[in-house]
Every structure is written in structure tokens, then in C-alpha cells.
Design a protein with these regions (language model features):
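Enzyme catalytic cores with a strong preference for nitrogen-chemistry domains
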Residues: 1-222
């Protein structure tokens, strides 16, 4: 962030089935020997799967990062992060292409955002990273509380950015209204999280919305 490493998010669950053999080379977050590291001339950088990045100047923006397979597990780490206050979960992924997987991935992202009453931002490896063994499609998704707000074109060979407006106020309101969310937070045993503040600040001036407000917001579209 602006020339400084705020923290290093580590993968919690490593797949070791079918075409995946990550445990041959890597270890999960639970095997970390320390909760800090020295990197790029910086000392004592927080490292782990327990980091929530909190933006100063933008109320309600608390970001958690998980990696690829973490989303495919029965209880993704982002569930615990959401119960600990995270409102936006991001997933840096290298989920390869197979028949029907895009629909399954889309459903996973939408459902996880609904379960956590959060935004979920998913960014997959691009087609240019494909090899003779596996192929990737550059699938990117932005979901908010069960709704897909934006989705990338798959298999694009051109650089692209997938953007969406996320309503943090709505998420806060929904979490307050849905009492079972706070009930789950009180009943669920979850690991402690470290919060890392950074001075993002809200942009100045008027910024056009990329998200339209429906004329009849209380009438279902279907």
C-alpha cells in the first residue's frame, strides 16, 4: 500500500487431491513459525490468516483476504472474519477451468457473500497463465449479500478491470437487522483477528455511481 507492506495474508487450506498437489511444496497458515516476518526492508510485518485491514476515513471498510481453496472448504476463513467485523472479503485465486466450474464458482461467491452478509471480491488467474497441464479463464466476480454485482469476461486476452460499487452502509444495516448474525458471533468459537489500520481516506469531489438504483426497489425483478 503506497510503497509499504501492510501485512501478508496466508492460505489456510491447501488442496492435495486430483490435479492439485500443493502440500508437496507448501505449508498452510497453521504451520507458520511466527506471526511476523521481515520483507523488502521492513521489519515485523504481520503475517497469517488472521489479518483484517481497516481503512481510516471510510467507515465500515474492513477487508479480509483468503486464497483460492479457502472458499471451497466447509467453513471458509472469511466466515470467522465476517463475524469478527470484516465487511469485504477478497479471494486471490488460481482456480482452473473444468466443465461446469464457472457456474459452481459463481454460486460459491454469491452464497458466501450472503452467508457472511458481506461483499466478496474474487479474482482468478488469467488465460495467459495457462500451461500444458491446466487452463485458467481470468474469472472475476464482485458479489454483495448474495447478489452478483459485476463479472468479468472469461478467457479474455486483453487486460481488464472488473468494478462495482459496494454499499457498506447497507451491509451494516443488514447485519444489525438480522439478529442471528450477531447471535452466531456470540456462539461461535473463532480465532482472534488482528486489525491493521491504514489511511486510505475517502476520495474528494463527486464520483459517479457505477451502480444504478432501480425505480421500484421493493418490487422483485422476477
Amino acid at each position: 500500500f503506497r510503497g509499504r507492506v501492510l501485512g501478508v495474508a496466508v492460505k489456510s487450506f491447501l488442496p492435495n487431491y486430483r490435479e492439485f498437489y500443493e502440500l508437496r511444496h507448501f505449508r498452510p497458515a497453521s504451520a507458520l513459525p511466527s506471526d511476523t516476518l521481515d520483507l523488502l526492508g521492513q521489519k515485523d510485518i504481520p503475517v497469517g490468516a488472521d489479518l483484517i485491514f481497516e481503512a481510516e476515513g471510510i467507515p465500515g471498510f474492513r477487508l479480509f483476504c483468503e486464497i483460492c481453496e479457502d472458499l471451497w472448504t466447509p467453513v471458509p476463513p472469511s466466515c470467522y472474519a465476517a463475524l469478527s467485523g470484516a465487511t469485504v472479503a477478497v479471494n486471490l485465486s488460481a482456480s482452473n477451468v473444468s466443465t461446469g466450474k464457472a457456474d459452481y464458482r459463481r454460486a460459491l461467491v454469491a452464497n458466501q457473500s450472503a452467508r457472511c452478509i458481506a461483499a466478496y471480491v474474487y479474482a482468478g488467474a488469467g488465460a495467459g497463465e495457462s500451461t500444458t497441464d491446466l487452463a485458467w479463464d481470468g474469472h472475476a466476480l464482485v458479489a454483495e449479500n448474495g447478489e452478483i454485482l459485476a463479472e468479468s469476461e472469461r478467457f479474455s486476452r486483453k487486460p481488464a478491470v472488473t468494478l462495482a460499487d459496494i454499499d457498506l452502509g447497507r451491509l451494516a444495516g443488514d447485519r444489525t437487522t438480522i439478529t442471528t448474525f450477531s447471535d452466531a458471533g456470540g456462539r461461535t468459537e473463532r480465532p482472534p483477528f488482528r486489525r491493521i489500520s491504514f489511511p486510505l481516506g475517502a476520495p474528494s469531489g463527486i464520483i459517479p455511481l457505477a451502480r444504478t438504483v432501480p425505480r421500484f426497489p421493493y418490487v422483485p425483478s422476477d
